Amino acid sequence: MKKLHVLFLSMALILVLAACSLDNGSTSKESDKGASKDSLTIGLSISTLNNPFFVTLNEGAQAKADALGAKLTVADAQDNASKQASDVEDLIQQGVDLLLINPVDSAAVASAVEAANAAGIPVITVDRSSEGGEVVSHIASDNVAGGELAGQYLTELVGKDAKVVELEGVAGSSAARDRGEGFNKAIAGQLNVVAKQTANFNRAEGLTVMENILQANPDVVGVFAHNDEMALGALEAIAASGKDIKVIGFDATDDAQAAVKAGTMAATVAQKPEEIGSKAIEAAVQYLKGETVDASIPVELELIK
């Protein structure tokens, strides 16, 4: 009887130890899961950090990453599509969990997106889209609608049949394409575009291009620039010429808003770069946690005048 009692005690002890082992295993899995959440690494390939808009977008992304406990690794493509392809490859080799890509060129970036797809790394495009590859989501303002806002207001300012200029962004970028599409849709049959040239979203180029346009077209009365940097460059050329020309930009950077307030710039279409960056990180973390993310996440626009 004594032997039987000992046997029962031994069996009970084995069961208790087994239960403890199971509990420890469950806790370990939960800890591992929590660790993976805390150690998410997100790569951001950004078109340029030499533009206030994208600096603010990057800051919004970093702030949200910090808040959510994610690590953000940023690569500045310096407005060079080839460098961006190399940057994306580097981020893939680093083993990031997800890639945020703000394309320099929407067509050229497709191969980089496809490379990430092949490596099993999900991609979210930010502000500008990719013309190829698979993306989880696209986060941006409605650039076509923004171009329409600019076109409608410029028509209101300068009147029907007035001669105007369109300063275009980087050729091949979806932002330049979409803003131009919206602008031209709004002014069709209303305004006469006498010059349409790229200034690559750059203030210095905006100045030079506008100087040349004014020499050939001294009777221009309005300008739509695909971003504020080009608009501000155009304003310098206009000021030097002594002409009164209405200029509308896009992005609502601090300098542009100051120019609108001062009365030198007619208006700027306000994007919210900080919110775009923040939403991008938010969507990335949600996706990596297995949550559903919308294929398109819009950010509202408004006209500041």
Predicted regions located by residue number:
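Bacterial lipoprotein signal-peptidase II cleavage site
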Residues: 18-37
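Extracytoplasmic "Venus flytrap"
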Residues: 41-64, 68, 72-90, 94-96, ...
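Hydrophobic alpha-helical segments within soluble ligand-binding/sensing domains
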Residues: 42, 84, 139-164, 205-207, ...
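Flexible loop/hinge segments that line or gate small-molecule binding clefts
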Residues: 98, 106-145, 156, 163, ...
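Hydrophobic alpha-helical
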Residues: 98-117, 183, 200-258
